[in-house]
Curated annotation (Swiss-Prot):
BP-aspect Gene Ontology terms: translation
Protein name as annotated: Small ribosomal subunit protein uS7
HAMAP family in UniProt: Ribosomal_uS7_B
GO cellular component, one term: small ribosomal subunit
Organism this protein belongs to: Ruegeria sp. (strain TM1040)
Paired cysteines (S-S): none
């Protein structure tokens, strides 16, 4: 690993259909083996399903679902004198977004519907209504942070 300087962050281009950068990040995370066109097709078809189910703009629904999954606090392990404490820390905005995207995709992949489009649409609809696996993951993370509040003075 180079010690000279950190690699600069590359700008993510907005997606073709909706012109949304966050949606592009979502597609990039969903993509397997560099098959971006497949990821795009899955997302756009899932959006069509969402739009037909609840008559709202799919990008609006996507952002609302993402907001419902974003964690505000998480726990980090901190070793103090031979003991490891789970210290609650606030989550940076970029990481919030990244975690929400990752959790939504993982939850969608774990569902029982037939196609990935159906799974993704189902998970997005659940997340908008504050249910589903991704939202549960966020709640669990918050509970963990709440339970370990006593160790918050170990924050760094």
């Amino acid at each position: 690993m180079s010690r000279r300087h950190a690699a600069e962050k590359r700008e993510v281009l907005p997606d073709a259909k909706f012109g949304d950068r966050v949606l592009t990040k979502f597609m990039n995370n969903l993509m397997i083996d560099g098959k971006k066109s497949v990821a795009e097709r899955i997302v756009y078809n899932a959006f069509d399903r969402v739009e037909s189910k609840i008559k709202r703009a799919p990008v609006e629904v996507f952002h609302e679902a993402l907001d419902n999954v974003k964690p505000s606090v998480e726990v980090r392990s901190r070793r103090v004198g031979g003991a490891t404490y789970q210290v609650p820390v606030e989550v940076r905005p970029e990481r919030r977004e990244a975690l929400a995207i990752r959790w939504l995709i993982t939850a969608a992949r774990g569902r029982n519907e037939n196609t990935m489009e159906e799974r993704l649409a189902g998970e997005l609809l659940d997340a908008v209504q504050s249910r589903g696996t991704a939202v549960k993951k966020r709640e669990d993370t918050h509970k963990m942070a709440e339970a370990n509040k006593a160790f918050s003075h170990y924050r760094w």
